């Protein structure tokens, strides 16, 4: 079963690498300041994202309408 097909799971998409600097500039942050997602996360695996990719997560909120979040994919270290 695809995790993303569940109605409660927000949309996840990989931001093109060339757009990451624009995102960081827009929010005046550094890459490492983004919240993290492990490369073993089911949605990271489903989107085929790799460490260093940034995922754009779009979800609907009853109070705010559409909300967008960004997460940096990091490698799992054992």
Swiss-Prot record:
GO terms for biological process: transcription by RNA polymerase II; transcription elongation by RNA polymerase I; tRNA transcription by RNA polymerase III. Gene3D superfamilies: RPB5-like RNA polymerase subunit. Coiled coil: none annotated. It catalyses: RNA(n) + a ribonucleoside 5'-triphosphate = RNA(n+1) + diphosphate. Its main location: cytoplasm. Keywords: Cytoplasm, DNA-directed RNA polymerase, Nucleotidyltransferase, Transcription, Transferase. It is found in: Cytoplasm. The keyword Ligase does not apply. PROSITE patterns: RNA_POL_H_23KD (PS01110). Part of the RNA polymerase complex. DNA-dependent RNA polymerase (RNAP) catalyzes the transcription of DNA into RNA using the four ribonucleoside triphosphates as substrates. Belongs to the archaeal Rpo5/eukaryotic RPB5 RNA polymerase subunit family. NCBIfam families: PRK09570.1. This is DNA-directed RNA polymerase subunit Rpo5. It comes from Methanococcus maripaludis (strain C6 / ATCC BAA-1332). The lineage of its organism: Archaea, Methanobacteriati, Methanobacteriota, Methanomada group, Methanococci. The gene is rpo5.
């Amino acid at each position: 079963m695809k995790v993303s097909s569940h109605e409660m799971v927000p949309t996840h998409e990989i931001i093109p690498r060339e757009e990451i600097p624009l995102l960081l500039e827009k929010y005046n942050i550094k890459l490492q300041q983004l919240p993290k997602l492990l490369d073993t996360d089911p949605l990271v695996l489903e989107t085929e994202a790799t460490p260093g990719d940034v995922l754009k997560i779009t979800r609907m909120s009853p109070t705010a309408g559409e909300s967008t979040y960004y997460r940096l994919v990091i490698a799992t270290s054992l």
